[in-house]
Amino acid sequence: MSKIFDLFIIGGGINGAGIARDAAGRGLSVCLADKGEIGGATSSWSTKLIHGGLRYLENYEFKLVRESLKEREIVYKIAKSISKPIPFIIPYADKIRPAWLIRLGLFLYDNLGGKSNIPKSKTFDLKKKFPNILKEKYKTGFQYFDIQIDDKKLTKLNAQDAKRNKAKILEHNKVKKAEIIENEWVISLENGKKIKSKVLINASGPWINETLHKNIKIKSKKKIRLVKGSHIITKK
């Protein structure tokens, strides 16, 4: 236990692995531990989409969308082998939103993030592409693109890159306890080993509250609120 790491990360999901990659790439000494395998839980159960958040434009959250689109482009650039543009179709009916508003929103979505290698949005002939499926009022639509990615592979690649920069990646190593002793974090693993670190990061995903209270023994007035999304998948 002689070595003191700059950073110890609990959790090997995309957040933990991403932090490890970034920190190790900046020259910090990093150790990451996960109770299972890297990317083996929530980060492999996602929608597998990297998107800019088109719907946030209606709430005038332009800064958020711009940042998300820039990050989408970065991910697509560095992980092109495991990602691809995927089209989305918005059926148009004049009683829902005016066409000019949708066009404006998609124009902003195409350009807010700066130069992009992802296809631009365009109008779409619904009747020609999907005859006898949609109601008569849905004749025209709009097509835009986001990125679909292998989420688990992305997480593993982040961890591998961190490891190449001398980060220590510990799979199947559950953190039993973490406590501050003489201004340093002492992390006890379930296998009996102890690790020292200057900084501790709790990136345990949906187990973050449990880890905070049971393993780190810190009482917090605020709790992380979990969010779940659902997608309906049908045959073509």
Feature map (PLM): residue ranges:
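Dinucleotide-binding Rossmann-like beta1-alpha1 core, especially the glycine-rich loop
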Residues: 48-130
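Core beta-strand elements of the Rossmann-like FAD/NAD(P) dinucleotide-binding domain
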Residues: 3-5, 190-199
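Flavin (FAD/FMN) cofactor-binding and adjacent substrate-gating region
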Residues: 92-171, 177-183
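Beta1/beta-strand and adjacent pyrophosphate-binding region of the FAD-binding site
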Residues: 2-15
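Flavin (primarily FAD) binding-site architecture
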Residues: 202-217
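Central beta-strand plus flanking loop segment that forms part of the substrate or channel wall
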Residues: 50, 219-236
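Glycine-rich FAD pyrophosphate-binding loop
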Residues: 24-45
